[in-house]
C-alpha cells in the first residue's frame, strides 16, 4: 500500500513539474515566435542597426564599401597599365567604368533595396496567412496554433506525461521550444546578410569575386522565403480537425510540427 502511494506521489510530482514547464513554454513562445518567424520591415527600423549599416555613404559599413570601390578602381587601373605593357587582354575601360557607376549607385541604395525586398517578401507570407484567415475564420499564426494544440491535447488539470496525450503535449511543447532557437538564429542571420549587402553588390564589379554575390543571393532568398513556406505549413496544419478524440488529427499535427522543425 505504501509503495503504491509512493509511486502515485512520484507520478503526480513528475506530472506537476512537466505541466508547469510546458505551461511556461507555451505562454512564452506565442509572444515571440510569430515576430521571429514573419520578418517585416521592422527588422530594419533600429537606430543602432541603421548606424552600423550606414544611412549614407559617409558612415557605417557603407564607408568601408565605398573605400573598396575606390580600391577596385585602383586595382583595375594598375591591371590596365600592366596589360598595355605585357600586351594582355582585359576588360575594356568603358565597360569597367559603366559597371563601377551602376553597381556603385546600387550599393549606396542597398539599404532601401533591402527594405523594399523584405516588404515584398512579408507581403507574400501575409497574403498566404490572410487566405487562411478568410477560410478558417481565425489568424494563421503560432499563437493561434498553440491555442488549438492545447485544445487538441488535454486539460492542464488532467495532464499525465505517461499517457498518449501527455506524450503528444510534451513533443509539441519541446518542438515549439526548438523553433524559438531555430528562428532566432534565422532572424540574426537575416540581419547579418543585410549588413553585408553592399559588399555583395560590390563583388559584381570584378568577375573573379562575383561568386560572392551569387552565394549571398541564394542564402538571402532561402532565409526570407522560409517564412512563406512556414505560412503554407501552418495553413495545412489548420486544415486538420482539432479534436482530442481524433488520433489521426493528432498524428497529422505532430507531422506538421515536425515539418516546421525540419
Predicted regions and their residues:
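Structural signature of hydrophobic alpha-helical transmembrane segments
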Residues: 63-71, 159-166, 191, 223
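Non-cytosolic segments of integral membrane proteins
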Residues: 10, 14, 21-25, 104-196, ...
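Alpha-helical transmembrane segments
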Residues: 201-218, 239-243
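Hydrophobic transmembrane alpha-helix segments characteristic of membrane transport
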Residues: 68-104, 196-210
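Hydrophobic alpha-helical transmembrane segments
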Residues: 52-73, 94-108, 112, 124
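Alpha-helical transmembrane segments and their helix-start/interface "positive-inside/aromatic belt" motifs
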Residues: 3-21, 92-108, 213-220
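Binding/recognition "hotspot" determinant
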Residues: 1-68
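Transmembrane helix-bundle signature of multi-pass membrane transporters/permeases
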Residues: 216-224, 255, 259
Amino acid at each position: 500500500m505504501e509503495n503504491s502511494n509512493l509511486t502515485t506521489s512520484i507520478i503526480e510530482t513528475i506530472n506537476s513539474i512537466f505541466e508547469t514547464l510546458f505551461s511556461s513554454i507555451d505562454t512564452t513562445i506565442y509572444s515571440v515566435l510569430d515576430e521571429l518567424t514573419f520578418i517585416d520591415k521592422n527588422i530594419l527600423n533600429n537606430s543602432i542597426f541603421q548606424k552600423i549599416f550606414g544611412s549614407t555613404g559617409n558612415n557605417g559599413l557603407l564607408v568601408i564599401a565605398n573605400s573598396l570601390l575606390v580600391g577596385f578602381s585602383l586595382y583595375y587601373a594598375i591591371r590596365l597599365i600592366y596589360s598595355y605593357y605585357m600586351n594582355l587582354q582585359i576588360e575594356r575601360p568603358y565597360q569597367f567604368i559603366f559597371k563601377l557607376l551602376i553597381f556603385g549607385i546600387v550599393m549606396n541604395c542597398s539599404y532601401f533595396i533591402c527594405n523594399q525586398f523584405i516588404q515584398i517578401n512579408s507581403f507574400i507570407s501575409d497574403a498566404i496567412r490572410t487566405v487562411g484567415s478568410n477560410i478558417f475564420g481565425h489568424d494563421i499564426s503560432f499563437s493561434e496554433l498553440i491555442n488549438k494544440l492545447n485544445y487538441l491535447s488535454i486539460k492542464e488539470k488532467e495532464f499525465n506525461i505517461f499517457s498518449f496525450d501527455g506524450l503528444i503535449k510534451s513533443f509539441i511543447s519541446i518542438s515549439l521550444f526548438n523553433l524559438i532557437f531555430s528562428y532566432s538564429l534565422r532572424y540574426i542571420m537575416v540581419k547579418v546578410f543585410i549588413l553585408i549587402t553592399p559588399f555583395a553588390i560590390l563583388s559584381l564589379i570584378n568577375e573573379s569575386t562575383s561568386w560572392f554575390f551569387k552565394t549571398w543571393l541564394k542564402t538571402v532568398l532561402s532565409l526570407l522565403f522560409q517564412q512563406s513556406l512556414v505560412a503554407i505549413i501552418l495553413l495545412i496544419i489548420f486544415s486538420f480537425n482539432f479534436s482530442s478524440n481524433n488520433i489521426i488529427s493528432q498524428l497529422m499535427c505532430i507531422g506538421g510540427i515536425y515539418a516546421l522543425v525540419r
